[in-house]
């Protein structure tokens, strides 16, 4: 039975995180930015699970923390989308550059 090496998990996590970071920094659509942030959180979860499984002392702590992170990410997505809907009703746009509601 062949096992996937830790470097494969870490490489995939780095690629996912870089794609998410690039999208979060370059895109102007708020929905896309939220999706990219979720992608970055999933890359962190992949690291947690990989180190939990392939670390020096394998245990379920990383997996439990990953589940907790997913619950927090779901709450973050729900709150972010609720704020986005409220801003869209006021401004009729979802572009980051035009979100200046808090300016005096």
UniProtKB/Swiss-Prot annotation:
Catalytically driven reaction(s): a quinone + NADH + 5 H(+)(in) = a quinol + NAD(+) + 4 H(+)(out)
Name assigned to this protein: NADH-quinone oxidoreductase subunit K
Gene Ontology biological-process annotations: ATP synthesis coupled electron transport
Major localization listed first in the record, in broad terms: membrane
Lineage of the species this protein comes from: Bacteria, Bacillati, Bacillota, Bacilli, Bacillales
Annotated transmembrane regions: 4-24, 31-51, 67-87
Family: Belongs to the complex I subunit 4L family.
Cell membrane listed as a keyword: yes
Gene: nuoK
Localisation per UniProt entry: Cell membrane
One Pfam family linked to the record: Oxidored_q2
Enzyme Commission (EC) number: 7.1.1.-
GO cellular component: NADH dehydrogenase complex; plasma membrane
Classification via InterPro entries: NADH_UbQ_OxRdtase_chain4L/K, NUOK/Mnh_C1-like
């Amino acid at each position: 039975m062949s096992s996937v090496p830790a470097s494969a998990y870490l490489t995939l996590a780095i690629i996912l995180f870089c794609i998410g970071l690039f999208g979060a920094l370059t895109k102007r659509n708020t929905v896309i930015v939220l999706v990219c942030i979720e992608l970055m959180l999933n890359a962190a979860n992949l690291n947690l699970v990989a180190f939990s499984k392939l670390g020096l002392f394998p245990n379920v702590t990383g997996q439990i923390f990953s589940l907790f992170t997913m619950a927090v990410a779901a709450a973050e997505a729900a709150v972010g989308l609720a704020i986005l809907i409220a801003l869209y009703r006021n401004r009729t746009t979802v572009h980051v550059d035009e979100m200046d509601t808090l300016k005096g």
